[in-house]
UniProtKB/Swiss-Prot annotation:
Name recorded for this polypeptide: Large ribosomal subunit protein uL16
Keyword entries, A-Z: Ribonucleoprotein, Ribosomal protein
Taxonomy, superkingdom: Archaea
Record CDD domains: Ribosomal_L16_L10e (cd01433)
Organism annotation: Methanothermobacter thermautotrophicus (strain ATCC 29096 / DSM 1053 / JCM 10044 / NBRC 100330 / Delta H)
GO cellular component annotations of the record: ribonucleoprotein complex; ribosome
Keyword Ribosomal protein: yes
Recorded GO MF terms: structural constituent of ribosome
Length: 160
């Protein structure tokens, strides 16, 4: 893993995060079952991928369980700022561009640095909506650039 590049006071023009909400669904109720998506390897997950996963899983759960039948939580935040050295292409690019000279790069995105087995998204729900929550997390896991697994955090005895 790389060391986090997060000192915002030294960095100009940091792109904003696309993640709109971190908690969705019924925030006040206590649900007996809790499931999470955990990554199988250390990786970097962009704010775009986190937002795509949030939209996919939240939309599925809203259609299946209704607004009050679940609580979805994003558990990571994209603090790490990613830089890119823009390379020009096309005719005359060699005259315009510096190549690897002054190659520090400009901030282009933010990512969440995730460790192995770290949980990224959690859905709390009841027994009736367990299969829907599992499918919603599977759809969210497809948006990530790393193999994931679905873990039952709480209420394993209720679903067997």
């Amino acid at each position: 893993m790389v060391r986090a590049y997060t000192r915002r006071e030294y960095i100009k023009k940091i792109p904003g995060s696309k993640i709109v909400q971190y908690d969705m669904g019924n925030l006040s109720a206590e649900f007996p079952i809790s499931l999470s998506v955990a990554v199988k390897a250390p990786t970097q997950i962009t704010h775009n991928a986190l937002e795509a996963a949030r939209i996919a899983s939240n939309r599925y759960m809203q259609r299946r369980a209704g607004r009050m039948g679940y609580h979805l939580k994003i558990r990571v935040y994209p603090h790490h700022i990613v830089r890119e050295n823009p390379m020009a292409t096309g005719a005359g690019a060699d005259r315009v561009q510096d190549g690897m000279r002054k190659a520090f790069g400009k901030p282009v995105s933010t990512v969440a640095l995730v460790k192995k087995n770290q949980k990224i998204i959690t859905i709390e729900t009841n027994k009736k909506n367990f299969k829907d929550a599992k499918e919603a997390l599977r759809r969210a896991a497809m948006k990530f650039p790393v193999p994931c697994r679905i873990v039952i955090d709480r209420g394993e005895e209720l679903v067997k």
